[in-house]
Amino acid sequence: MPEKTIQEEIQTIIPELFPILEPEFDWELVKNFYDFLKRDNEKGGFFSKNDSEKILERHILESLIFVWKLKTTGYVSRETNVADVGTGPGLPGFLFAVLKKAPQVFLVDSQKRKLALLEAEITTGSLSKVKKRVEFIYARTEEISSNFDVVTSRAMVPYPYLAEVTTRMVKQKGILCPFLAQPYQDLEKETEVLSNNGFVLKKEILIPELEFVGKRHIKILQKNSLPKKGYPRDWKEIVKETKSKNG
């Protein structure tokens, strides 16, 4: 029996949603990215042993649906520049680059071990087709000053402190889109952190399509003003507060 294509594998997992996703992405690139993650996983230390057996559903598919949600809700287009912080081997950020109508993508990570392998694959390997629309930034997020339309992150800094770490990266009226699991319960603290760093909560996008891996949602945080005086704080102060909040 011939091996299943990546489209067939994904259709088995999400049979009702796949016909909607299929026309949005370049599936040859999706397959090549999946193959890269499997091939270089041990070298790059991309995933835990348990997750290494679930790369397609827990990482590729989860990221594809995140990207699709932001595109279909109008937050990402060909004219957008998107920065994905703490991207590791390009998750979820690289999947923006495999949209048929792809934005300009900036992959950000201070650790070169994982991301440099993806850069090599794009430069001279199976992902060279996206070379002109993907750029790499090896720097600490809190040290980057830029003007990105959209900044995304899956698991770099606990929410809502991601807003403080990334505020210098997001342009005025730009958006920060954390990809989150369980809802954040301390609404007073959320409002305080967002307000101190110039953000307001514009929208929350639930992702019932990902219930097979757990609860997932996206916050749409719009940067409406400059941070208040004294913000963003030093990285050590932010870390200290996140640890105290998490007990």
UniProtKB/Swiss-Prot annotation:
SUPFAM superfamilies in alphabetical order: S-adenosyl-L-methionine-dependent methyltransferases (SSF53335)
EC nos: 2.1.1.-
Matching HAMAP family: 16SrRNA_methyltr_G (MF_00074)
InterPro entries xrefs: rRNA_ssu_MeTfrase_G, SAM-dependent_MTases_sf
Top EC class of this enzyme: transferase
Protein species of origin: Leptospira biflexa serovar Patoc (strain Patoc 1 / ATCC 23582 / Paris)
Binding-site residues, S-adenosyl-L-methionine: G86, L91, R154
Protein name (Swiss-Prot/TrEMBL): Ribosomal RNA small subunit methyltransferase G
Location in or out of the cell: Cytoplasm
